[in-house]
Amino acid sequence: LINHYDIDTKLYSYHDHSSEKEIARLLDFLKDQKDVALISDAGTPTISDPGYSLIRECISEEIDVVPIPGASALTAAISASGLPSDAFTFIGFLPTKKGRQKKISSLENLDTTLVLFESPHRLLKTLNQLKEVLGERPIVVARELTKLYEEIIRGNFGTTIKYFEA
């Protein structure tokens, strides 16, 4: 979008591995009364995104944080799912290794709609693991929302797993 709209500004990368020096540089920039936009290449900043730690630092430094509402995969998916949305639990990304099975097991007794994020290369494995714990329940997999290849697959674990195995 930045290139499309010919926006010419400094860009700084911020991620899980950003150093204290990089964080301090951004905070100094903000303290100098400069405006900064936190954007993400995958959804809403700070939602299952390392941006929350920068926000936390801004708050501790008493730097104003002004949210600008926009597209969110979480709300887009839940609104198009057809599943109950009066109460839902947002899980975010499951751990990739340590604690993964424990986290999945902890979902068993939740009686709300569950919303998870998952990468395409782990999706099938995750669906199978969730099915073992949650049984055959209605599910929706929504991906590439609002993009050219948007896809919303509704069914249960069995039918959805078959869909992705094909």
Annotated model-derived regions:
Residues 1-66:
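Class I S-adenosyl-L-methionine
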Residues 5-9, 28-30, 55-57, 81-86, ...:
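Short, hinge-like loop/turn segments at secondary-structure boundaries
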Residues 8-15, 65, 86-92, 136-142:
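Short hydrophobic/aromatic-enriched beta-strand-loop microsegments
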Residues 13-20, 71, 91-96, 144-146:
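Short, acidic/turn-prone active-site loops that include or flank metal/cofactor-
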Residues 24, 49, 77-79, 101-102, ...:
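Short, well-ordered secondary-structure micro-motifs
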Residues 34-35, 113, 117-166:
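A contiguous loop/helix-start segment that scaffolds small-molecule binding in enzyme catalytic cores
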Residues 40, 65-70, 116, 141:
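General beta-strand structural signal in soluble alpha/beta enzymes
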Residues 53-110:
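Class I SAM-dependent methyltransferase SAM-binding "motif I" and its flanking Rossmann-like core
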